[in-house]
A protein has these predicted regions:
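Zinc-dependent metallopeptidase catalytic helix centered on the HExxH motif
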Residues: 168, 291-352
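Acidic/His/Gly-enriched intrinsically disordered linker/tail segments
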Residues: 325-395, 406, 412, 439-455
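Acidic/His-enriched low-complexity segments
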Residues: 1-257, 261-269, 394-396, 436
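Catalytic zinc-binding patch centered on the HExxH motif and its immediate surroundings
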Residues: 248-250, 265-270, 278-291, 301
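Structural recognition of the beta-strand scaffold that forms the well-ordered cores
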Residues: 204, 237-238, 270, 275-278, ...
Length: 455
């Protein structure tokens, strides 16, 4: 997507009116320059969706509340192949023009001034589709018969709802989802109600914590909900396809213990609820969708994967990468968190990773802080990212290391941040000069030799 800019800074009264000079610009993501939009900041998305399985169609009314960060005569939303029937801005009909592969350019009846709050309502229909993605993931949403699930990382949310589909613009969400009787719905946050109608049920959810678009989850299926209470009274709900049996007796039974360990290491769990959603197929991946990570029948029996996706609630979901180049802030940290869990539970720990990579390997000859757009999920992002944290942990000592992580999480909670932001926190808290270490481990093409960095 792209967005509207104001007059260029050198414009004066003699120049053309803003309509002529306004330009639509993206957010400048280094990997996905056409994703996301400038000119405004979204505060809230209200998604009202109706699933028609017979037609494999989702009817949607998405209400976006935003603030203009520039004077705007027009602005852009990310919208991929949405069949848009109407758009209003502040209740007045607006012109909407699909442009390129991702953009819906909206021209309101009246220009918006910098600082104005405005409300956009888009009425549309969407069909399931997956986009070309990076490595493991083809982002988008899947319908299998009556059933629906989503996995949007990195830029697939725009296949289901018009949005500023970039992790630097987080917002609160509510969901109202109408499905044929007999189907259930799971979504981020808390279930607020399920109201039966004529052959349908309407489920509503609120997700009051700041959330990136790629972390939205929506599952429609015949679902069983298993409820319990986690540390500090945290609501824990596991939502499991009714055709999937027995998973709650596996490593999933340790969920409260996992939360407890990470609360102790990293600070309080950041959101209103937790639990996983399990769909009835082997997905080949799991994704840390906020408050409700998605698992297939394969990964839900893996304790390390359950731990990894929980860790992402802190690292990735609460503190989100400001650009996709910063993806190691998600994956390296969740990988290191797995090792800290193993250490706490007597199953080894960080030294195991160091032993695995005692000798440099070409597998990790990719800089974690710049893997490239097709390698977001490369082994180096996970393991060399985690080794960077291992070297940091060993360099500053465990107490200082955990203070760095907690400071990072407190400072950027509900926000997005960069690799540079993390390096600054690490140096500030430790008082150490860490640039050479970060340069070697995050940015050098070749994997460093661990022996050169840890005694």
């Amino acid at each position: 997507g792209s967005g509207g800019a104001a007059d260029p800074p050198d414009a004066d009264a003699g120049d053309a009116a803003p309509e002529a000079t306004a330009e639509l610009t993206g957010l400048g993501d280094p990997y996905y320059p056409d994703v996301g939009n400038s000119g405004y900041d979204v505060g809230d998305y209200a998604l009202d969706l109706t699933w028609h399985p017979d037609e494999q169609r989702m009817d949607g009314v998405t209400t976006i509340t935003a603030v203009a960060t520039d004077d705007l005569t027009r602005f852009s939303l990310d919208a991929v192949d949405l069949d848009v029937s109407s758009v209003t801005v502040d209740g007045e009909p607006a012109t909407a023009t699909p442009t390129g592969e991702r953009d819906l350019i909206v021209e309101p009846a009246e220009p918006l001034g910098q600082g104005d709050e405005f409300v956009v309502v888009v009425t549309y229909a969407a069909a399931p589709q997956l986009l070309a993605g990076a490595d493991l993931l083809s982002p988008g949403w899947v319908a299998d018969g009556d059933e629906v699930y989503v996995a949007f990382e990195p830029h697939g949310a725009a296949t289901l709802f018009p949005s500023n589909d970039h992790p630097s613009d987080k917002a609160t969400y509510s969901f109202t989802v109408t499905v044929p009787t007999g189907l259930d719905v799971a979504a981020n946050g808390m279930l607020r109600g399920a109201v039966p109608g004529d052959g349908v049920t309407t489920f509503s959810f609120s997700a009051p914590d700041q959330m990136a678009t790629y972390l939205v989850q929506l599952v429609i299926a015949d679902l069983d909900v298993v409820e319990s209470t986690g540390p500090g009274g945290l609501p824990v709900r596991h939502v499991i396809d009714a055709d999937v049996g027995g998973v709650v007796e596996g490593p999933l039974a340790r969920t409260a213990e996992m939360i407890d360990v990470f609360d102790d290491l990293f600070g309080p769990y950041p959101f209103v609820a937790y639990g996983v959603v399990v769909v009835d197929e082997p997905l080949g991946y799991a994704l840390e969708t906020q408050t409700l990570p998605i698992f297939g029948t394969d990964a839900v029996t893996s304790e390390p994967t359950l731990v990894h996706e929980l860790a992402h609630q802190w690292f990735g979901d609460s503190v989100t990468p400001a650009t996709w180049q910063d993806i190691w802030l998600n994956e390296g940290f969740a990988t290191y968190a797995e090792l800290l869990w193993r250490e706490r539970t007597g199953q080894g720990g960080p030294d195991d990773l160091a032993a695995t990579y005692a000798e440099p390997t070409p597998l990790l000859d990719l800089p974690p802080a710049d893997p490239g757009p097709t390698e977001l999920f490369a082994p180096s992002v996970y393991d060399r990212g985690a080794l960077t944290l291992y070297v940091l942990d060993r360099t500053v000592g465990r107490d200082v290391f955990l203070t760095i992580l907690r400071t990072w999480l407190e400072r950027y909670d509900d926000s997005s941040a960069t690799t540079g932001d993390f390096e600054a926190v690490a140096e500030e808290v430790s008082g150490a000069e860490l640039t050479p270490m970060f340069d070697a481990w995050l940015r050098a093409p070749q994997m460093p030799d661990l022996d050169d960095w840890v005694g």
